[in-house]
Amino acid sequence: DDLTAELIAAAAGVPLVLHPDAEQHVRRWCGERSIEPNDANLKQAWLPEGAELIDNPVGSAVGFALDIAGTLVLTTPGVPSELRAMLPAVCARVTHKLGGGELYRLRLQTFGIGESTAQALIDDDKTHWPDDVVLGFRAGMPQLEIKLTASADTPDVQRCRQTLERLFGDHILGEDDTTLAGAVQAVLRNQGKKLVTAESCTGGLIASMMTAEAGASSVFEAGFVTYANDIKQSVLGVSEATLETDGAVSEAVVVQMLRGALQRSHADIGIAVSGIAGPGGGTDDKPVGTVWLAWGSADDLHTWHTVLPTDRRMFQQLVAAAGLDLVRRQLLGLPRLPHYFSRRAI
């Protein structure tokens, strides 16, 4: 039911025509999936007369470019994954239209620092930023992307890059599309080590984040999701007495969970978490949002406790992210952050 092509054709005062390359693209896409193309599929091949096709490498609907009275109009499908795949071609057309060269772009992925703090660090720094350098931020759970764009790669621009690396230091995970889990993977791979997880309140989210990254099999050993207390005992060897005395959300239990996971795998380092995700289950001593984490190796084990008063889904995401960063920092010999998302840390 997309009306984009029709409306742009009307604005340009030209008819819609069956674009042969677009038709071939639609038929090939359908054929690869054993689909007989119908009218709805083939409608995607009808473009404004004079339009130039923009290939879609992942979907059936192509994009197109059309000059309307000196204005370049570019269209893409609305599906985010398809848009991302087509952006290089779209940007190339815009650059060509404007007659400019290739822009210099730097995207630094950071963790553990907020946008306002990042801006304050930059504002307080005495570095001179060239006029053609544009800085920006894109906040996304759980990372902050710091973007630097300039008209060209010059020595001044490289000095700006070095300034960002100095200001944000060990908060930097990597460049471009590096994720927190991807950064952990890279360190594990460089050190020839493997990770094991033992999760209760996060329900396997840490393992899921790790295995969502390509190449996980070389660095991820196993993941134990031990939600119920009896499974903590039978699978990981957590003591019944410890559970009764300290409770499932306690330092003693996550330590035993971690030791059990390490003993039952060939992993070099592990992370264990147990908490109260809510909305119920909290007490005066252990309110909703309480979480204990244990991480490290058998002979170098650490624990940490915090309270994250938020909704259940966000709680799980925050705990998983904090756990991965704790592993990353231990592997790199870095101190843990003083707090993760909350200042109610102990």
Spell out what each predicted region is.
Residues 1-15, 164-177:
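Flexible gly/pro-rich beta->alpha loop and the following alpha-helix that scaffold active-site loops
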Residues 2, 16, 20, 41, ...:
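Electropositive phosphate-/nucleotide-binding environments in soluble metabolic enzymes
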Residues 2-98:
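Proline/glycine-rich low-complexity loops and linkers
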Residues 13, 42, 48-50, 60-61, ...:
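Short coil/turn connectors at secondary-structure junctions
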Residues 27, 155-346:
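Short alpha-helical segments enriched in small residues
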Residues 37, 97-102, 217-221:
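Short, structured loop/turn "capping" segments at alpha-beta junctions
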Residues 62-66, 146, 290-296:
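Short beta-strand scaffold segments in enzyme catalytic cores
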Residues 67-142, 149-157:
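Accessory alpha-helical/coil subdomains and C-terminal extensions
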